[in-house]
């Protein structure tokens, strides 16, 4: 629970950037047809969900999100694959830093004190 709160605090640290990206349905379709298969959802259901993400992300396109996570296999996959998908689909760049558990706790505590 404590780690979840720390992770969420780190994930919510947003910064503006001059970054622009192509984002939208063609990118979502490409990810749905490749990395996001197999799925319990049909491709049409996945696309409906992606359309919601695209629309919800529109006001934030061009922003940059800094995420700090513990180095575990799930977070490594998120950092290497899902951050790229998220950026291509939403136009929001993700900087995903992976550290050991103690380093994550220390980094978040330092950030909270500043």
Locate predicted features.
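Bacterial N-terminal signal peptides
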Residues: 9-18
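N-terminal export/targeting leaders of redox proteins
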Residues: 5, 18-23
């Amino acid at each position: 629970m404590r780690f979840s709160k720390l992770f969420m605090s780190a994930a919510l640290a947003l910064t503006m950037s001059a970054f622009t990206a192509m984002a939208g349905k063609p990118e979502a379709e490409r990810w749905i047809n490749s990395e996001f298969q197999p799925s319990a959802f049909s491709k049409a259901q996945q696309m409906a969900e992606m359309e919601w993400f695209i629309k919800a992300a529109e006001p934030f396109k061009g922003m940059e999100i800094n995420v700090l996570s513990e180095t575990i296999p799930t977070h490594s996959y998120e950092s290497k694959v899902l951050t790229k998908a998220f950026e291509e689909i939403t136009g929001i760049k993700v900087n995903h830093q992976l550290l050991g558990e103690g380093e994550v706790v220390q980094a978040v505590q330092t950030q909270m004190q500043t």
